[in-house]
């Protein structure tokens, strides 16, 4: 199966500047294509997983993935579909986040010097050296403000009478220049992104056409939500991160294990590497035994992101907790100072400190709603003092928030 054919078959396709021509070119030759990521966190989360799988698919078909880390544009912030001005990051934060993002991506694609090896570039390399007057002189005449004002991402903010700074308004010019720079210096002929990036992508393709006459393409993916309308990558407990220092492989496994029934076949198609035959069998399994299908999906996706050993460990932990009622040391663990436990800590504070509630008020609400357990016993008093008497074997206390979220507190 060819790249574009598989791209469409897996459900990645939304829009393309010239699909027929791009299909023909990718059949005849290998191309370089890029996707950009802002440096807004020390890890990517599953909201970026489709884009990551596309980079992986490109590489598997012999094309060259280019990853752009927006060290330059992150200093401004993308206004696309954002209701508010984004916080501007320091150079130190951007560098730290870029390192974490490369760690996320390295789980899925190979970086190196080979023909199809991925490369990672920071657009600060070329944007930081910009002279503003030179940029206006050399590129300003190619951009139409009339057209920029009609783009949905800008129009939305204006219609709501929300602040859109000149700083953010320049973002689309810089992203267009990124595409031009990559086309000129890396022979990049395709930019990929979410459907919310369509306007920015088209502006870049137009800039290249006007300046150099090169044939380049833009292609977008649909914006994904769960079947209930929730945004991919976010849960009540926070983001579903790809890096294990922010989210344990067990919690990653549990996210997919607990996804909505209506989503599992679609997620298998988007995020797994099942062959068509395996996918057909998976669809049959999902119709006959939804829980078995969810376990298989969670296992496969955890293996892909972390390792087969991590997937096995997560599965074994889940079996011990949910099917055998045991405590497993592979559960996510937080460390509490022994002095704190000796002095005693209220139940609601402990749930907050352990990360099972984002605030103390949320922890109180969890307990009042009968959703909190300590050592598998319901917590009825939010002010109950938890001390060393609650320690189980191996000096741990098991905390549970609802039926699915568990954590060990270790001293």
UniProtKB/Swiss-Prot annotation:
Q: What compartments host this protein?
A: Cytoplasm
Enumerate the UniProt keywords alphabetically. Answer: Aminoacyl-tRNA synthetase, ATP-binding, Cytoplasm, Ligase, Nucleotide-binding, Protein biosynthesis, RNA-binding
Lipid metabolism recorded as keyword = no
Q: Give the Enzyme Commission number.
A: 6.1.1.1
Q: Where is this motif: 'HIGH' region?
A: 39-48
Task: Give the binding site residues for ATP.
Answer: 234
CC annotations in GO: cytosol
**Residue ranges of the S4 RNA-binding domain?**
345-411
The molecular function GO annotations come to: ATP binding; RNA binding; tyrosine-tRNA ligase activity
InterPro entries, alphabetized: aa-tRNA-synth_Ic, Rossmann-like_a/b/a_fold, S4_RNA-bd_sf, SYY-like_C, Tyr-tRNA-ligase, Tyr-tRNA-ligase_bac-type, Tyr-tRNA-ligase_bac_1
- Enumerate the residues binding L-tyrosine: 34, 171, 175
Q: Which reaction does it catalyse?
A: tRNA(Tyr) + L-tyrosine + ATP = L-tyrosyl-tRNA(Tyr) + AMP + diphosphate + H(+)
A Pfam family in this protein?
A: SYY_C-terminal
Q: Motif ('KMSKS' region) spans which residues?
A: 231-235
Family as reported in the entry's similarity comment: Belongs to the class-I aminoacyl-tRNA synthetase family. TyrS type 1 subfamily.
Which protein, by its recorded name, is this? Answer: Tyrosine--tRNA ligase
